[in-house]
Amino acid sequence: MTINFIKKKIFIINNQNKIIIFLLIFVIILLLSLKLSPGKDWDVFYSASKLLLEGKSPYNYETFGNPPWSLIISIPLVIVFPKKIAGDIWFVIGIFFFAITAYRLHAKPIAMGLFLIAPPTVHCLLNGNINWLPLFGFTLPPYIGLLFILIKPQIGIGLAIYWIINAYKSGGFIKVIKIILPTLIAYILSFVLYGFWIKNMFNIYKVSKLWNTSLWPYSVPLGLLLIIFGIKKKDPTWVYGAGPFLSPYVLFHVWDAVLVSLLRKTWILFFIVILLWIIVFYKL
């Protein structure tokens, strides 16, 4: 017991600066959240969750266009807490998932801190969006992760292609089916229960097309190149950022996926985060 206690103390002492930096970032972003109302995207998830709890289709809320399992975390919050408090907790959960994703992808503490204060991350958190859930899917086995990363296809489509091609190369169609079957069943059941809810995505596009930052179709070759590089090098890190380049609809916070691909390249991440903040302040 004494030896284990001493080891824990040594670990804390050796990592105290890293721990302090992380806690400071967490507290600053949290305080900023508490000063603001929950973001408009939280309104969407809150309203869709309430409809589901009332036995109605969450897609009656016309700007909810994610699969029904994207509400797995918001539903308990809606049951227990008022909207504002639930929104604040949602914000904290977002920070946790962003941080745990960076940790599971072997980011150094400085890289994790840069990722948490990057403009796309802050934008996602303040708007109450859910990018942290599909990004967390990057760290899961493909047969589970596919369910998560396709919550936002503009984030996960590149990695989905990579997983499927890798599965085919290593185990043929049988392995591909094993990977895609849980997600395929989930989508089929959702269509049976709620109809072709994907049409709501077009409503989202109409509402937010003014904020579309997609570089499509000019960015498609780059997205495909990242997938090819990842397959050749057998390294999914290359593919993490491919999704936004392949999608015709990309809001600013979706570019977080590109930052995830740079979590193990601290200096590059540092300069990109600084550049993004310069652009943000210039545009204000």
For each predicted feature, which ranges?
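Transmembrane-embedded, aromatic-rich helix segments that form part
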Residues: 148-149, 154-166, 258
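Primarily membrane-embedded glycan-assembly and transfer machineries that use lipid-linked glycans
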Residues: 2-139, 143, 164-266, 270, ...
